[in-house]
Amino acid sequence: MEFVHFLKNPKKYEELGAKIPKGALLVGPPGTGKTLLAKATAGESGVPFLSISGSDFMEMFVGVGPSRVRNLFQEARQCAPSIIFIDEIDAIGRARGRGGFSGGNDERESTLNQLLVEMDGFGTTSGIVVLAGTNRPDILDKALLRPGRFDRQISIDKPDIKGREQIFQIYLKKIKLDKEPSYYSHRLAALTPGFAGADIANVCNEAALIAARNEGTQVMMEHFEAAIDRVIGGLEKKNKVISKLERRTVAYHESGHAVAGWFLEHAEPLLKVTIVPRGTAALGFAQYVPNENLLMTKEQLFDMTCMTLGGRAAEQVLLGKISTGAQNDLEKVTKMTYAQVAVYGFSDKVGLLSFPQRDDAFEMTKPYSSKTGAIIDSEVREWVAKAYERTVQLIEEHKEQVAQIAELLLEKEVLHQDDLVRVLGERPFQSSELTNYDRFKLGFQEEDEKSGQIEEDRTAENDGSSPLEPEVVPT
């Protein structure tokens, strides 16, 4: 809103001797609405909006990139005040001197140099604001990020539960629903942790498509749940040929996850578990409603590790054989445990040291000795073995219940939390704070109470009694 206010009232800033911010870098993961925010800024301020992608500057001919930069800023000056938005600026803004020895690299650097000159070349009263979007701010040239070019870095993260609820409200208005949008927005926000704005739009569209395929006249909750399943797990494949032994193995594997999570204090609440094949590899999955905690304790991560190993433990204890189905679980456990030992400083043997893992694969040397690496590897194996031992013990204690859940899964294919409560009873651990799953369930309870209150009001209206007189409160 700061840039909107400047573009609407530039003289107010200039009279006070303030220099107008020349640019802002919109930083965030894909799908969070960086481009949409830039469009909204132009719409709110009512000024011309010039948009271009970083890759549009690059062509096979030498000199085209710098020429396009000059033409873009010349056009912006002619219709000032205006906004220039450069999407995916990392295509031309990558730090100079990195990677590549070809002429194409020189062309990119020439384009970047021209952009630096243009951003620092026009006067502060010209009324041009440059917005740029990227999800890789770490690779951008330092000269591009200095004050005087991009004065602001605006972080646009994935929305929290309140943000998701507001985004759902917008997209639900475009869909023909059987209830008010507010009925769904609260529940769906709780069911979609970690979803970006683009994911939410996709869920709403998928729900409408599913309703249309099922010959429905309105979109209902079951359609939204099916859409979320499809976005998370992939396309449902009921016609996939699976042997009885494989189906039984998958049922016991998923049952192990469900029961382990049920009796672990810090495990995330289970929403549902299914053995319906989805996507390219998933033969079944358990869906949880995680709380969006900003901090995690050692105990929480240990319980999460145990819950992830629940499937492998159930196969070993109840079937006596282990399968390749736990590959994805073991991958998650390995990554999680290495982070605890080598990044978060949870290991006494490694000490209070942190070696963050890089996202790219270009790190040839590690920032620690081979001896320290051996200690880290040994600690990770020891921690995973301890977590697996705890999980096997838990599955042994609840062996009969694991078998019951597995047989129910083979019969129904999909089990919700209510089905687990009938077999396992209520969870022995209750959170002192409201969880995302509590918010999801609370929405239905409030709706039931509201509908019950409406019925009571109708009964009171029809019993022939006189309406209540309004009470006058003196002021």
List the predicted regions and their residue ranges.
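Amphipathic, well-packed alpha-helical segments that form the structural scaffold of globular domains
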Residues: 1-8, 90-93, 116, 169, ...
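Flexible hinge/switch segments at interdomain interfaces of large molecular machines
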Residues: 43-48, 90, 135, 178-183, ...
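AAA+ ATPase "lid" subdomain C-terminal helix
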Residues: 190-222, 226-237, 258-270, 340-347, ...
